[in-house]
């Protein structure tokens, strides 16, 4: 699968996973990233997904995916069992994002975490001038019908990383699906991808 067929954050992650790596994709959906990593990088991929229909779709692609919840089921994975643990656009749906990231860093040597940036200027504009929760391309659901229970910003995420003593090995910011600079990323980036180490 080419980068063009992947969501921009997934394409960025795929380009940065080393060939032959052992990878756990948490919140893997239908396994789009897993299939790309398996086919293009020869990665040994596993997945954890809460939605049974998406688990079935991923298994139908020949992928090793189990149904489970990131908030509770990561405890069953042994320490250092993967080179990378990936959490893409799932952080904001977890009950305790800090505990989930801590589990990822226990399970994997490094963790990729991507999320929509709630502090992007369009969201701020919507709140400031419209007085309403933003609905954007990356946050498409109305406030009362969304899986998102935490709205994270780039600066908040960096603060969480700092507070827990984790290390940022890489950070990328996306706007309109394209990489953008880190200057004022909290204001101008729609999406963030971090590579962390415990």
Question: Where are the predicted features?
Answer:
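S-adenosyl-L-methionine-dependent methyltransferase catalytic module, highlighting the catalytic core
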Residues: 98-103, 110-198
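Class I SAM-dependent methyltransferase "Motif I" SAM/SAH-binding loop
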Residues: 27-29
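Conserved alpha-helix/loop element of class I SAM-dependent methyltransferases that forms part
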Residues: 4-20
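Alpha-helix C-terminal capping/helix-to-coil transition sites in glycosyltransferase folds
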Residues: 19, 80-81, 107
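Short conserved loop adjoining the S-adenosyl-L-methionine
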Residues: 73-79
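Class I SAM-dependent methyltransferase SAM/SAH-binding core
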Residues: 32, 36-73
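A short SAM/SAH-binding and catalytic strip from SAM-dependent methyltransferases
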Residues: 84-96
């Amino acid at each position: 699968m080419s980068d063009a067929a992947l969501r921009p954050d997934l394409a960025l992650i795929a380009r940065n996973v080393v060939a032959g790596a052992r990878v756990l994709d948490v919140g893997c959906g239908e396994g789009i990233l897993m299939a790309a990593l398996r086919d293009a990088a020869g990665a040994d991929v596993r997945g954890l997904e809460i939605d049974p229909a998406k688990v079935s779709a991923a298994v139908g692609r020949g992928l090793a995916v189990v149904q489970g919840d990131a908030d509770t089921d990561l405890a069953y994975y042994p320490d250092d069992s993967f080179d990378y643990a990936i959490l893409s656009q799932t952080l904001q749906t977890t009950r305790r994002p800090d505990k989930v990231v801590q589990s990822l860093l226990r399970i994997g040597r490094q963790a990729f975490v991507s999320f929509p940036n709630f502090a992007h200027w369009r969201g701020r504009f919507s709140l400031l001038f419209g007085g309403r929760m933003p609905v954007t391309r990356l946050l498409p659901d109305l406030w009362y019908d969304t899986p998102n229970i935490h709205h994270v910003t780039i600066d908040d995420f960096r603060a969480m990383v700092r507070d827990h003593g984790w290390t940022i090995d890489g950070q990328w910011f996306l706007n309109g699906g394209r990489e953008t600079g880190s200057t004022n990323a909290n204001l101008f980036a729609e999406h963030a991808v971090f590579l962390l180490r415990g």
